[in-house]
Amino acid sequence: MEQILTVIPAIDIKDGRAVRLRQGRRDQVTDYGDPVERAHEFERAGATWLHVVDLDAAFGVGSNWKIVESIVREIDMKIEVSGGVRDDASLERAFTSGSHRVTIGTAAIENPSWIAKILNRDAGKVIVALDIRDGRIATRGWTEETIPYSEAIRRLDGEGCLRYMVTDISKDGTLTGPNLELLEAVSAVTSSSVIASGGVATLEDIASIRELVPQGIESVVVGKALYEGAFTISEAIEVAERS
């Protein structure tokens, strides 16, 4: 089987700036400049997808929606929008902005009846974020731990979820390598597609995740490694698409 992995650069926005957090902690922030310019850089480098996160909305402390809208409007890439999508109004705003997919985290766990309705209507455009710490789902900007991820997947699979984004919180923003065991474990309990996120530090990490494509891993979100110059997006794409 040909193993082609999609590489998705990430732009996390806080207080109007492109930033990276370490393990989701708001007190460990690195500023990487203008998010719109960062998006243009990824576009020029050949990325076809972009993952955009409004961190302030995710934490419930504000909004960077005007910047998100600017990115969606100006950038000729497919956009995944994430952060603070928890009800009909915020979901509709994300869809009408022109984004191709919307990532839902907290509400998918805390509001089962709502996410079931959304998946019944728009499953192809929805990603459910499984942000995992010690085997359990963390919500509300990763500040509250809830149910085991396997329990969440059983319910969400039954409701028609087609795509999950799996993040090992302990790896996110650390450049210590992805949790391949977790990715394999999640893939083993669902037939839905999985997007890997968190910890990617080297091109070898990209190659390792590419080996999991036959198990259901379809793409990988990369953030800090790109900002810190560990490799370029074009180099990552070349490795990911190597047969």
Task: Annotate each language-model stretch with its function.
Residues T6-A10, W49, D76-E80, H100-T103, ...:
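Structural preference for beta-strand elements that scaffold enzyme active sites
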Residues D12, F42, L50, A94, ...:
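Conserved, mostly hydrophobic/aromatic
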Residues D15-D27, E92, S99-D172:
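Conserved anion-binding
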Residues G24-E43:
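Short catalytic helix/loop segments, enriched in acidic residues and glycine
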Residues R44, T48-S97:
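N-terminal active-site wall of soluble small-molecule enzyme domains
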Residues G62-E69, P112, W142-E151, T176-A185:
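Charged helix-capping and loop-helix junction motifs
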Residues I75, I79-R101, E181-G216, A236:
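Catalytic cores of alpha/beta
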Residues W114-R121, R210-S243:
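C-terminal helical cap(s) of enzyme catalytic domains, especially alpha/beta-barrels
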